[in-house]
C-alpha cells in the first residue's frame, strides 16, 4: 500500500471512492476547489496496482478571528481495504501537512452521531475531542458532532525530527572535514558524502528520532472499521 499527495488527475477517482463509501457526496468542482487551493493537504491511498482505495480531502479554514487550523472535509476507505490502518495514516499525513505548510494549531471535522466506528477512530486513536453538537447538520436531518484535534504534540515531534536531521548534517560535515585534514585528500564525491550522511544520521538519531511516517506505519487503529463512513458534509 502507498500513501501519497493527491494530484489533479486523482480527483475523479477520489469522487468515485466517495460515491461508493459515503452518503455525503460532492460535485467535481468542490474537489477541484480543494485540490487547487490547498494542493498540499489531500492524500490518497493506492494499492499495488496504483488503484485508489482511500482518500482524505482536507483544507485550511479561513477564519481571521481564530488561530490557523485545518479541516477534514471527507475521509473514505473502500470496504475491501478497511482494518489496515489506512484511515489513520491518511489523517496523520493531512495533519502533518497542515502543520508544515500552514502552521496549523488544530484540525476539525464533523461526524454523524450514529457513526460509532468513526467516533471510535477519532476519539480513541486520533485524539479528537467533541467540541459541540450541531443539530440537523446533515441533509437527512441527523445531528453531527463537531470535533477538534490539537496539533501541538505533532508539531513538537516534527520540530524535534528536523532538529535531529540538522544536527546529523553538521556531524557529517565535521566528519568529512576531519577526514580531509587527516588524509589530505580531495573532497569526496556526492555519492560518498550522501552515504556518510545516512550512516551518521542513523547513528546519531538512534531509536528516539524515528521518522513520524514510520511511526504511523506501525500504529494501526484497533477494533475500527477504518472509518470510511466518516465525512464532513462540507458547508
Curated annotation (Swiss-Prot):
The modification Phosphoserine is found at residues 186, 205, 209, 213, 216. It comes from the Eukaryota. Its EC number is 2.3.1.255. Cleaved by caspases during apoptosis. Residues 1-58 are annotated as: Interaction with NAA15. It catalyses: N-terminal glycyl-[protein] + acetyl-CoA = N-terminal N(alpha)-acetylglycyl-[protein] + CoA + H(+); N-terminal L-alanyl-[protein] + acetyl-CoA = N-terminal N(alpha)-acetyl-L-alanyl-[protein] + CoA + H(+); N-terminal L-seryl-[protein] + acetyl-CoA = N-terminal N(alpha)-acetyl-L-seryl-[protein] + CoA + H(+); N-terminal L-valyl-[protein] + acetyl-CoA = N-terminal N(alpha)-acetyl-L-valyl-[protein] + CoA + H(+). The modification N-acetylmethionine is found at residue 1. Residues 175-235 are annotated as: Disordered. Its main location: cytoplasm. One of its GO terms (cellular component) is nucleus. One of its GO terms (molecular function) is protein-N-terminal-glutamate acetyltransferase activity. Gene3D superfamilies: 3.40.630.30. Residues 1-152 form the N-acetyltransferase domain. It is found in: Cytoplasm; Nucleus. The modification N6-acetyllysine is found at residue 136. Component of the N-terminal acetyltransferase A complex (also called the NatA complex) composed of NAA10 and NAA15. Within the complex interacts with NAA15. Component of the N-terminal acetyltransferase A (NatA)/HYPK complex at least composed of NAA10, NAA15 and HYPK, which has N-terminal acetyltransferase activity. In complex with NAA15, interacts with HYPK. Component of the N-terminal acetyltransferase E (NatE) complex at least composed of NAA10, NAA15 and NAA50. Within the complex interacts with NAA15; the interaction is required for binding to NAAT50. Interacts with NAAT50. Catalytic subunit of N-terminal acetyltransferase complexes which display alpha (N-terminal) acetyltransferase activity. Acetylates amino termini that are devoid of initiator methionine. The alpha (N-terminal) acetyltransferase activity may be important for vascular, hematopoietic and neuronal growth and development. Without NAA15, displays epsilon (internal) acetyltransferase activity towards HIF1A, thereby promoting its degradation. Represses MYLK kinase activity by acetylation, and thus represses tumor cell migration. Belongs to the acetyltransferase family. ARD1 subfamily. This is N-alpha-acetyltransferase 10. It comes from Bos taurus. The lineage of its organism: Eukaryota, Metazoa, Chordata, Craniata, Vertebrata.
